[in-house]
């Protein structure tokens, strides 16, 4: 007598389903407040943690699928999707966050146009001026604490660091240091330019210096042979070589 057909669900499939559920939850948390005009807090740490969790779980599922089938296309597709998610999060934090918009009450008391106010208080074209005046002098004068200074400077240094992993593996031309550096500088400058046009956040040449400098430093670090081999293994899913 024939046994009834039973379809086996592999562990990698269950893991990928779990990652998909978490991704849906992330998407809902991003869209729901905008649809309902609700001032729901979306802490940066929680958003980043959820997105990192999605990436780690889905990568594990893709790796197990590759080990089972020998097909690495899913792993490479997932890593490309992670790059897209990273770019979305970056643009969301720099251009679309409601906290970046000017406070209308300040404009009323300033007695000037929105553009004039923004250009006066949120634009800096002098290299290292904000780093020195806002952070170093601010810390020395007691206006900001050490933790705030370090967190903001490190945040700017780390913001574009993932580019050092993704760009050279997505496009071979980006493996040349000068091409990578030019791409990152232009990308950061484009974001700062959009902030200037949209009048959100601050348009600051020091952000270009810190963002691009951090990305290029990480690029050089990942060029160290053991780290370069590890990054290639992560990208291909082949840790045996």
Residue ranges and their predicted role:
Residues 2-199, 219-241:
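Bulky hydrophobic segments
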Residues 178-179, 205-209:
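Hydrophobic alpha-helical membrane segments of integral membrane proteins
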Residues 192-195, 207, 211:
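Active-site scaffold segments
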Residues 157, 161, 208-215:
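Alpha-helical transmembrane segments of multi-pass membrane proteins
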């Amino acid at each position: 007598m024939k046994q009834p057909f039973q379809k086996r669900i592999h562990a990698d499939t269950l893991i990928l389903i779990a990652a998909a559920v978490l991704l849906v939850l992330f998407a809902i948390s991003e869209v729901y407040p905008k649809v309902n005009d609700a001032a729901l807090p979306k802490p940066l740490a929680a958003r980043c943690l959820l997105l990192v969790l999605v990436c780690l779980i889905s990568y594990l599922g893709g790796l197990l699928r590759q080990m089972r089938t020998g097909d690495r296309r899913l792993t490479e597709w997932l890593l490309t999707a992670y790059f897209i998610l990273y770019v979305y999060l970056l643009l969301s934090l720099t251009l679309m966050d409601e906290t970046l918009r000017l406070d209308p009450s300040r404009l009323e008391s300033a007695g000037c146009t929105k553009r004039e106010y923004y250009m006066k208080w949120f634009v800096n074209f002098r290299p290292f001026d904000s780093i020195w005046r806002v952070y170093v002098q601010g810390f020395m004068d007691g206006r900001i604490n050490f933790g705030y200074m370090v967190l903001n400077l490190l945040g700017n240094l780390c913001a574009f660091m993932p580019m050092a992993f993704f760009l050279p593996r997505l496009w071979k031309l980006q493996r040349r240091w000068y091409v990578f550096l030019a791409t990152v500088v232009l990308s950061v400058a484009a974001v700062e330019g959009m902030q200037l046009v949209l009048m959100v956040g601050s348009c600051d040449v020091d952000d270009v210096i810190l963002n691009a400098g951090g990305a290029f430093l990480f690029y050089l670090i990942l060029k160290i042979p053991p780290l370069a081999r590890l990054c290639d293994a992560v990208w291909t899913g082949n840790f045996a070589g």
